[in-house]
Amino acid sequence: MPSQDEVEEFAALLRHLKGRTDLSYAALARPLHINASTLHRYCAGEAVPLGFTAVERFAALCGADPAERVELHRRWILAVAARRRSRTAPPPAPDAT
């Protein structure tokens, strides 16, 4: 499913950035003013933040360079759009058997 691929690409970049630090989810989440479990869900691809502010601050904490920040923003836009599409998709038609 394309939408899940876009969400996973966003999550993979978050995990890559987190992996460059020696900080726990709790240590990274604290200055972002979000719960550690929320940050973990973002990194696992289980959720996508509706706003970019926390993602931008996360990137800064992880030492992302300008090109990585642009790529993270691009992937976030695609992930948000994919989640919106998956939520508004019509239910599958029932079988006519």
Where do the model's predicted regions map?
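Short amphipathic recognition helices of helix-turn-helix/homeodomain-type DNA-binding modules
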Residues: 1-18, 30, 49-97
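Ca2+-coordinating acidic residues in Ca2+-binding motifs
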Residues: 27, 38, 54
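Short, charged low-complexity linear motifs
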Residues: 26-27, 44
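Flexible coil/turn residues that form the inter-helical turn or adjacent wing/linker of helix-turn-helix
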Residues: 21
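Recognition helix of helix-turn-helix/homeodomain-like DNA-binding domains
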Residues: 33-50
